[in-house]
Every structure is written in structure tokens, then in C-alpha cells.
A protein has these predicted regions:
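Cationic-aromatic interfacial patches
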Residues: 58-163
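Well-ordered beta-sheet/strand-loop patches within structured domains
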Residues: 58, 125-128, 148, 166-555
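Bacterial N-terminal signal peptides
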Residues: 43-53
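Short, Lys/Arg-enriched N-terminal segments with co-localized hydrophobic residues
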Residues: 20-32
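Bacterial N-terminal signal peptides that target proteins for export
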Residues: 32-44
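Serine residues within intrinsically disordered or low-complexity segments
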Residues: 9, 35-38, 54
Length: 555
């Protein structure tokens, strides 16, 4: 989902991948667009296929050299057998049966033409499906995410891609280039392999025991210096996860390196690293490696959907992480220019939607036009109970023709409920949008904005809004967005924010904004996991399990 950009040493966000367009290769942090490879694979190689008279073309065979499978057939079945390293299911492509059939064909008696034709068709169908799945994912995101339709530069023709790769005799390379060409994707594949190795680890043979002072229906708490019956199990689990060194002696109580290991674990799971094991930390410690494997697989699937950073700048908000990152490409390298905490929509009823749009303007000292749903459910009832709230919060009524009325009456409240008037909040220190909002027009009317409620950024879980996204560092974000407009210095930005008069500024260059959802990421060699706050991983998991595999038949 943009997600997914990184610097050599900076964080890699689990949220984007190349889709359809020129491959993006990053070696040691250097970004290169392999458009020449893309053009060759999709154009020139097809011309070669059609006119160069190779034995492959002449006989109409892709995988066989006469009666025996060629080397690329072996490469293909190896790729299919290794599909699990991408979080895919090898048997979706009939990998075992095809692998055995190719082995038998290579070692046994010569096959009849009809058998060869069936194997050719089955292997071609399997490889086309594999390339399509590894390139753009198995599920259309629009089937499970309202209005999410990420932009893709061009369609992916798996059949043409495969044929061109075979003619060029570079099938393994072409298959690798079909996957998202970003560091995070490869880092997550490594994490996937690591967590698969832990699936049968004895550290999870039974759950950790209840915490000290726990009561029926109430969780306890483990703090430094306390005794705990599960101390050895806890240490074993932290060693298995890499948060505790294996040679550390087990203390008699919860203290020392064990507390430090729990803090490292908490840091990797989006929790306050205070070393105190409460209900939430215990719940994360109980999650099995098998569940983490599935979480990584789902994140890899999301990476295959998400749009590539095609321009010089991009903003990505990762909802489960509650973090915004602003990226810039300079000298062929991707740099994280800004990273800040955000507040997103409440999981229960006002979730922030996923989408991909362009930021086009900024509003300084904005009015807050109260959405009708909030006016009906919250503001009008509050004003009936507490009329003084109207003046204290700087509210006013606005008619359809733009007339403004700052007098609170029962008739005006009735008119708001009837949809005849609306409520807005004037610019000022109490304005719910703060001093600035960042606009990227979209059907859900979602935007980024400042907030006077800065204390919310201190929470681990930050889903408090009505859907829009509150940013922790609005001035820094404005400086990034206005980078192409040097006349907008930090001083000028601050003046516009504090003037108290609403003003709109059009951007000279739109900035892509991606609101993404990734519950796993890798940064600085560590794998991080975040709570599935909106249940979207569960939704994706169910959709993938319902998806009929339809493996290609070889009979």
C-alpha cells in the first residue's frame, strides 16, 4: 500500500509494492527503475518469440525439448514448490504433482505427444497463475475493502510475461522481478522463514500461567521484583523470539535482563516498553509462531496490491501502527523525511478507510464544518443540555446560501436536524481541526489535520477520531508538503496557522497519499507486529480461505 518504502538504515513500512509498471530494484538503498528489463520482457522478447525461428517456437513447445523436459521446466517446478516463501500455497499451482510429473518425464521412458501437450498446458497454466498471484495478489482488494482501488500504471499480462521470460531464458530472474521489488517484501520473506522455524518450538507447548494477583475475570500484573510461576516459560519464549540472549541465567524473580527482554518485546509489538506485563502484553506473548506466520503471509498479500512510489514524494499512513511517514526520492535513494504518530478512526464505528489519492491543497486556520452525522448524534444533544457550549467552542450556524447565525435557538437546532442548516466551528485554539488541514479530495471526505487534543498521541492505541487522521507534527508535515514552494518558510507556515483567518493554499505539485493497513513490518533487522484493530486481517484471511484454488490438472 505505499506502504513499503525504506532507507538502508531507516524503517521499512509494510505497505507497497510495484504493480504492473517498471520494476523497482533497490540495492544497498539505491533505487533503480529496471524499465529496460520490463520493456524487453513485454515487447522485444515477444517479437523474438514470433520471428526468430527457435526450436521452442517451431515445435510449439515451451517446456519440453523433444520428448524430455527442458531446464526451464525444472526451474518452473522449483519456483512453484517454493511458492510458500512468498506466503503463497504451492498446491494452488499443483506443485507436487507437476514436480513429480516433470521428474518422471526426465528419467523415465519417452512420453507420447498427447501427454507432453497436457504437461505443457498444465505447467503453463500453473506458472501464469503463479506470476499473476506473486505480482498483484490473489484477492482483488475491492472485494473486501470499501472504495479501495489503488492506482496501477498498467495491466499485467502474465501469459506474455511468461513467454517472453522463456524466450529470454531468464525464468527465475523474471519471476523474481514479478514480485514487489522493495526491501520490505524481501525482509518479510526472511521473517516468514524465521517464524516458520519456530512453529513447533517447545516454548509454546502450553500457555503462560496467569499473572500474579489475577482474579477470575480480571487480569493480574507482573512488575519488576515479583515472583512468577511462569518465569522459566517466559524466559524460554523470549529466547526463542530473540528478545533475550540464550546464555542469560534465570533469576529467582522477575528482574534484570528478563525485564529488558520484555521491554524489547513490547517495543516490537506496539506497546509502551515499560517492562510491566499486564493483560495486553501477556496476550501478545501468548500468540503462537503459527499465528505470526499467517500475519506475515497476509502482509505479503497486501504488499502485492499496493501502489509503487512513482513520483518524488509520497505520504503513507499505516493504520495499525498509528504512524505517518513522508518519503522523498533524492539521487536515486528513498529517504524517510518525516515520521510521526497519528490518531485514526475509532475501530468500533468510525474507521478510517483505505485509499490512495493526491494531496492538492492545504487550509490554514480552517473552519470545522461539522458532519451532519456528528451534529445529529453529538453536537445538537450537547447544546440542548449545555447551551453555553455553543459560545465556548466558537460554534455558529450556516444556511445553504452561506448566511451565518451565531444565535443559539431551539429552532436553529431543529433546522440542523432537518438538514436545513449546518453547524461549523470557527478558527481558533479550540477548533477540532487545529490550525491546519491537509486535503486530498476523496469520496469519504477524509483528510489530515492538526488537533488541540495532543495528549492522545501518548496512547499506545490511537483510534480516537471520527475517521479523519490527526497528525502529531503539523508544521513538519507542512514543510514537507510545501517543499516545492520555497517561499513557504517555516515562519510563514506558522504565521498562516496562527492568523485565525481561514485561507486555502493550492499545492504546486500534488503529493500522493496512501492510507494503508499493515500489521507487520521490519525495521533495523527486527520484525514488528501490530494489533489488527479493524479486523481487516481476519477479513483477508477468510477471503483467501474461501478462494477456490483450482489447481491446473495434468490428466
Amino acid at each position: 500500500m505505499g506502504w513499503p518504502l525504506a532507507t538502508p538504515s531507516g524503517p521499512v513500512l509494510a505497505l507497497a509494492g510495484a504493480k504492473g509498471g517498471p520494476a523497482l530494484t533497490i540495492d544497498n538503498g539505491v533505487m533503480r527503475m529496471t524499465s529496460a528489463v520490463s520493456r524487453f520482457i513485454r515487447g522485444a522478447a515477444i517479437a523474438l518469440w514470433l520471428c526468430c525461428g527457435s526450436s521452442m517456437a517451431a515445435e510449439g513447445l515451451l517446456w519440453f525439448d523433444g520428448a524430455r523436459p527442458g531446464p526451464q521446466a525444472s526451474q518452473a517446478v522449483e519456483l512453484l514448490a517454493a511458492a510458500a516463501t512468498h506466503g503463497l500455497e504451492p498446491e494452488d499451482y499443483n506443485a507436487s504433482a507437476l514436480g513429480q510429473a516433470i521428474t518422471d518425464a526426465a528419467q523415465g521412458s519417452a512420453l507420447e505427444a498427447a501427454v507432453i501437450a497436457r504437461l505443457e498446458q498444465a505447467l503453463t497454466t500453473a506458472m501464469e497463475r503463479y506470476l499473476k498471484d506473486v505480482h498483484q495478489g490473489r484477492i482483488d482488494p475491492r472485494l473486501i475493502h470499501h472504495n479501495f482501488n489503488p492506482r496501477h500504471p498498467e495491466a499485467f499480462d502474465a501469459a506474455a510475461y511468461l513467454q517472453a521470460a522463456l524466450v529470454a531464458r531468464r525464468l527465475p530472474e523474471a519471476a523474481a522481478e514479478a514480485a514487489p521489488r522493495l526491501p520490505l517484501y524481501e525482509h518479510l520473506r526472511e521473517a516468514l522463514a524465521s517464524y516458520r522455524e519456530r512453529v513447533d518450538h517447545p516454548a509454546w507447548r502450553q500457555p503462560l500461567p496467569p499473572l500474579p494477583d489475577g482474579q477470575p475475570g480480571k487480569a493480574g500484573k507482573l512488575e519488576q521484583g515479583q515472583a512468577y510461576a511462569g518465569l522459566s516459560m517466559l524466559a524460554e519464549r523470549l529466547v526463542a523470539l530473540g528478545d533475550l540472549a540464550p546464555a542469560v541465567p534465570l533469576p529467582s524473580s522477575y528482574e534484570g535482563p528478563l525485564v529488558g527482554a520484555v521491554q524489547a518485546f513490547q517495543q516490537r509489538h506496539g506497546l509502551t516498553p515499560d517492562g510491566v506485563i499486564g493483560k495486553t502484553t501477556l496476550a501478545q506473548l501468548q500468540v503462537t509462531p503459527a499465528a505470526r506466520v499467517r500475519q506475515i503471509e497476509l502482509t505479503l498479500e497486501r504488499l502485492r496490491w499496493t501502489p509503487l512510489m512513482l513520483g518524488p514524494r509520497m505520504i503513507v499512513i499505516n493504520i495499525p501502527e498509528f504512524v505517518l511517514r513522508a518519503y522523498e526520492v533524492r539521487d536515486g535513494r528513498i529517504h524517510v523525511q518525516q515520521e510521526m504518530r497519528v490518531v485514526v478512526g475509532k475501530a468500533l464505528d468510525t474507521r478510517t478507510p483505505l485509499f490512495d489519492e493526491d494531496m492538492r491543497f492545504i487550509e490554514f486556520s480552517p473552519y470545522w464544518n461539522v458532519p451532519p452525522s456528528i451534529a445529529r448524534a453529538e453536537i445538537v444533544p450537547r447544546l440542548r443540555r449545555d447551551p453555553g457550549y455553543f459560545a465556548r467552542e466558537g460554534l455558529e450556524f450556516v444556511a445553504p446560501d452561506g448566511r451565518v447565525d451565531r444565535t443559539l435557538t431551539a429552532a436553529r437546532l431543529d433546522a440542523v436536524l432537518a438538514g436545513q442548516w449546518r453547524i461549523r466551528q470557527r478558527p481558533g485554539p479550540k477548533n477540532a481541526l487545529g490550525d491546519i488541514k491537509f486535503m486530498f479530495p476523496n469520496r469519504d471526505n477524509i483528510y489530515l489535520h492538526h488537533t488541540p487534543a495532543t495528549q492522545l498521541f501518548e496512547s499506545d492505541r490511537r483510534d480516537f477520531s471520527h475517521g479523519c487522521i490527526r497528525v502529531e507534527q503539523p508544521v513538519s508535515l507542512a514543510k514537507f508538503v510545501l517543499n516545492s514552494m520555497p517561499e513557504w518558510t517555516e515562519d510563514r507556515i506558522r504565521q498562516a496557522m496562527s492568523r485565525g483567518e481561514s485561507a486555502t493554499l493550492l499545492l504546486s505539485e500534488p503529493v500522493p497519499v496512501l492510507i494503508a493497513y499493515g500489521t507487520t513490518l521490519v525495521k533495523e533487522g527486527q520484525t514488528y507486529f501490530f494489533e489488527d484493530i479493524y479486523g481487516l486481517d481476519r477479513l483477508l484471511d477468510a477471503a483467501l480461505r474461501k478462494r477456490a484454488p483450482h489447481p491446473p490438472s495434468i490428466n
